[in-house]
């Protein structure tokens, strides 16, 4: 609901932000959930707000229905635009805190988690006043150090491809243990049988990448959204951390949940 999208390989139609999706049911569920991929709604199957939609609708606005007031709807959508990156940062911090190898920065990560959690639970005015860019800048150094600590556990010094354009790259069987792939563009990359253990995958774009047989155990900051946007098979080893969703194994595979959020 809150976010816009354009007609593309991920969506079959255009939708402006703040406009209800034509597939939204009265109970906020999706009327075509079981057929999203075959109908061309792949973007919906890989979207994850990290719980921000539920936080805004159920906590910040205490269950208020945006359909009853255009003004309330606009305010809720504005809060969601801030809440989503806050919850994304919380997810990354939680991933880093789950790892014993990142213990040297646990205190800093816990302080970041406390500040972000307090903001997420604040009133709408406080959330709207937050500077998302400043929040990212404050948390990113600890996340970067945590990622480096994970990468240091690799038996070999991994390559640094931070922000690299590796779209369509032929990396089948590549030894990418301990690699930095932060923000790398890996759309359509061939990563079959690649070894991605201890790799830092924060922000890596894996849409359409082939992870069949790839080993992602112990990789850091990869999310279920990233894996859902990639392709894989039964031999793809799940990655470590908090997320266990495998890459899509067929064009029809979608996340199991069919319920929508009042803000989505």
Stretch-by-stretch model annotation:
Residues 144, 152-264:
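Tandem repeat scaffolds
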Residues 1-107, 112-130, 135-138, 142-152:
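Hydrophobic scaffolds flanking metal-cofactor catalytic centers in soluble metalloenzymes
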């Amino acid at each position: 609901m809150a976010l816009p999208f354009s007609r593309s390989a991920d969506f079959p139609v255009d939708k402006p932000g703040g406009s209800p999706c034509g597939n939204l049911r009265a109970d906020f569920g999706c009327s075509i959930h079981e057929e999203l991929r075959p109908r061309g709604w792949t973007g919906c199957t890989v979207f994850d707000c990290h719980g921000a939609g539920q936080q805004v609708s159920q906590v910040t606005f205490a269950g208020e229905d945006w359909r009853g007031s255009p003004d309330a709807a606009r305010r809720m959508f504005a809060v969601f635009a801030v809440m989503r990156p806050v919850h994304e940062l919380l997810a990354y911090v939680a991933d880093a805190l789950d790892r014993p190898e990142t213990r040297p920065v646990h205190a800093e990560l816990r302080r970041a988690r406390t500040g972000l959690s307090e903001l997420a639970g604040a009133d709408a005015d406080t959330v709207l006043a937050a500077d998302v860019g400043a929040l990212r800048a404050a948390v990113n150094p600890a996340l970067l150090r945590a990622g480096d600590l994970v990468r240091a556990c690799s038996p070999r010094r991994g390559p640094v491809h931070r922000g690299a354009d590796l779209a369509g790259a032929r990396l089948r069987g590549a030894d990418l243990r301990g690699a930095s792939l932060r923000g790398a563009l890996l759309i359509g990359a061939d990563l079959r049988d690649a070894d991605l253990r201890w790799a830092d995958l924060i922000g890596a774009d894996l849409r359409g990448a082939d992870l069949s047989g790839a080993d992602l155990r112990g990789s850091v900051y990869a999310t279920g959204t990233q894996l859902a946007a990639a392709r894989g098979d039964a031999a793809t080893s799940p990655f470590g951390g908090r997320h266990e969703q495998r890459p899509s194994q067929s064009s029809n595979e979608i996340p199991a949940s069919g319920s929508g959020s009042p803000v989505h």
